[in-house]
UniProtKB/Swiss-Prot annotation:
Gene name, Swiss-Prot/TrEMBL: nhaP2
Compartments (UniProt record): Cell inner membrane
Keywords recorded for this protein, A-Z: Antiport, Cell inner membrane, Cell membrane, Ion transport, Membrane, Potassium, Potassium transport, Transmembrane, Transmembrane helix, Transport
Family annotation (SMART domains): CorC_HlyC
Biological process annotations from GO: cell volume homeostasis
Organismal lineage: Bacteria, Pseudomonadati, Pseudomonadota, Gammaproteobacteria, Aeromonadales
UniProt organism field: Aeromonas salmonicida (strain A449)
Task performed by this protein: K(+)/H(+) antiporter that extrudes potassium in exchange for external protons and maintains the internal concentration of potassium under toxic levels.
Domain of life: Bacteria
PROSITE patterns: RCK_C
GO cellular component, one term: plasma membrane
Reaction catalysis annotation: K(+)(in) + H(+)(out) = K(+)(out) + H(+)(in)
TM stretches of this protein: 3-23, 30-50, 53-73, 95-115, 122-142, 185-205, 232-252, 271-291, 304-324, 335-355, 364-384
GO molecular function, one term: flavin adenine dinucleotide binding
The family this protein is said to belong to: Belongs to the monovalent cation:proton antiporter 1 (CPA1) transporter (TC 2.A.36) family. NhaP2 subfamily.
Name of this protein: K(+)/H(+) antiporter NhaP2
Length: 575
């Protein structure tokens, strides 16, 4: 490769990435997922588009796809709170194993019939498109405030279901390549256990060693993110090399690092955010370049039928069966989880496997997978806001600062700076600072008014559009949010929870005269205990029950237990 070729590569890459970044603004205006924008830019630059770039190197696509996916999962793991496992771990694992197997089987049967393939070839297509995609799920759910049970289940499922899909894909490729007639089920189960066991063991063990290394090393601040990424990729590669699931390993590594005290945590997350965006852009650009629209047209109708079968039948059946043991999921939550079975880069990367193995019909497998992913992202991704409202799984977004950054003062305490802009309707407007009920251990360190820095004192009265800088901890965010945060554009709070918030510790017998309730059967219970009896354990914000003409909704949680309960009349529409 000469200097001119290298420079041309830099020029084209910079143009494509820059165009993807600038065009990403169209996502919100057109109501389509941002990943579709990146994919479309790649297709337009490809051989059938105005760019005319001929790219058919599947090994490079495999390299870029795996590298990008590893970084995305590392970032996703670091942003997942382990507290969400309280409500979502076992349901997500059920969907990641049983759910993927059922989706593969049902989709494979349809693929064999639609494309006139034998059963094993159809099952290979089912395995390729059988898993949800972490990049798509993290990207599309990141900006939405869904109830914790639903969002955590979808995120953990997408981060842990790839081992099953990879295992099924590799196994079926081996069967087709060697013309095997029978299956050694014991061997297959052993291999599946190896994938999950090594992935989980090395991911957690390697993550713990990486955590100790990061906290003990004395480096320039900018080097800690590089150490984190390189360590995560090392764990990913080592796990894959010995037959485990590198994808699961790096997700668990990120999960462990994100839930422990980590040196330069804020800087690392900031760098990872940029790398994740670059990974998504690069991965979908390459996959878009790899696709040839003229090759998709001949299989468009059967591929569309397969996508519809998977979205409307295979995925819902797998979700309903996978979640059968878990009674906490309401039918509307099951329906939403069924609908958000987003396919993304993983199926396309898995479709590269048959190409590299030289299987017959390999191009067909790739084209079908690409078409299914495109339909999934456009149809399911674009309808996500509407689906969340119809399923009533969207809850009012918790108040949050307009900016936050870490203070590397004490590794164990994890101090942060939170920036708040005061809106006119906040109750603290006009109040002196001495009257604010600040959370213990927090301090207002700066106040900006009309672009000027003021020295705040106890007698300073707050005004609309003041900007406050507060030092505190992550655990202080709920209380600070109630004091200072900008109200959302559409305040769902009163309409969703009701005008009255009651203490979960309130006795039912005390509430009876206020609301005209017959509490003879629950007179000895608190309101929180009553809801737990009605809805089961592991409650989340947004859980609700209709009882005696009123709707009772969990409004706040504290340490896994309800703290505040909203109450409203049934005729009030929360949406």
């Amino acid at each position: 490769m000469d200097a001119v070729t290298i420079n041309s590569f830099f020029l084209v890459a910079a143009l494509l990435v820059g165009a993807s970044v600038l065009l990403s603004a169209l996502s919100s205006r057109l109501g389509i997922p941002i990943l579709v924008i990146f994919l479309a830019v790649g297709m337009l630059a490809g051989e059938d588009g105005p760019g005319g770039i001929h790219f058919a190197d599947y090994s490079v696509a495999y390299l870029v796809g795996n590298l990008a996916l590893a970084i995305i999962l590392l970032d996703g793991g670091m942003r997942t709170r382990v507290s969400s496992f309280r409500v979502a771990l076992w349901p997500a694992l059920s969907l990641a194993t049983v759910g993927v197997a059922i989706t593969t089987g049902l989709t494979g049967l349809a693929a064999a019939w639609l494309f006139d393939l034998n059963l094993m070839q159809g099952m290979l297509i089912g395995a390729i498109v059988g898993s949800t995609d972490a990049a798509a799920v993290f990207s599309l759910l990141g900006g939405r405030s869904l109830n914790e049970r639903v969002s955590a289940t979808l995120e953990i499922e997408s981060g842990s279901n790839d081992p099953m899909a990879v295992f099924l894909t590799v196994t079926l490729i081996e069967i087709l390549a060697t013309n095997q007639q029978g299956l050694d089920w014991f061997f297959l189960l052993l291999q599946l256990g190896k994938q999950f066991g090594l992935g989980a063991g090395i991911g957690l063990g390697g993550g713990w060693l990486l955590w100790k290394l990061i906290n003990s090393a004395r480096l320039a601040p900018g080097l800690y993110p590089l150490l984190t990424v390189s360590g995560g990729l090392l764990i990913f590669a080592l796990t894959t090399a010995i037959g485990g699931s590198g994808i699961l390993a790096i997700y668990l590594t990120g999960l462990l690092l994100g839930n422990l005290s980590l040196r330069s945590r804020s800087t690392t997350l900031s760098v990872l955010d940029g790398l994740t965006w670059l990974s998504q852009i690069g991965m979908f650009l390459v996959l878009g370049l790899l696709a040839s629209p003229h090759k998709l047209l001949p299989i468009a109708l059967p591929a569309l039928a397969l996508a519809a079968w998977m979205i409307l039948f295979a995925r819902p059946v797998s979700v309903w069966i996978g979640l059968l043991p878990f009674k906490n999921f309401a039918p509307r939550e099951r329906w939403f989880i069924s609908w958000v079975g987003l396919r993304g880069a993983v199926p396309i990367i898995l479709a590269v496997f048959p190409m590299m193995a030289g299987l017959p019909n390999a191009q067909l497998y790739f084209n079908v997978a690409f078409f299914v992913v495109l339909v999934s992202l456009i149809l399911q991704g674009s309808s996500l806001p509407l689906a969340s409202k119809l399923a009533r799984v969207e809850v009012p977004a918790p108040p949050s600062p307009i900016n936050r950054s870490g203070l590397e003062i004490d590794l164990d305490s994890q101090w942060e700076t939170f920036v708040y802009r005061l809106s006119a309707e906040k109750w603290c407007i006009g109040s002196p600072l001495r009257d604010l009920r600040m959370p213990k251990g927090t301090r207002i360190c700066a106040l900006f008014r009309d672009q000027e820095l003021l020295h705040p004192s106890g007698s300073t009265c707050l005004q609309s559009n003041d900007i406050l800088c507060v030092i505190g901890h992550e655990r202080d965010l709920p209380a600070l949010g109630q004091l200072f945060s900008q109200a959302p554009e559409q305040d769902l709070g009163p309409r969703f929870f009701g005008d009255f918030l009651l203490e979960a510790a309130a006795n039912m017998v005390d509430l009876a005269p206020l609301y005209g309730l017959d509490v003879s059967e629950v007179a000895d219970q608190t309101l929180g205990d009553f809801l737990a009896d009605q809805l089961g354990d592991n409650l989340v914000v947004g859980d609700q029950v209709e009882w005696q003409g009123l709707i009772w909704t969990v409004a706040e949680m504290e340490e896994g237990k309800p703290r505040k309960i909203g109450v409203r009349f049934q005729e009030e529409d929360p949406v």
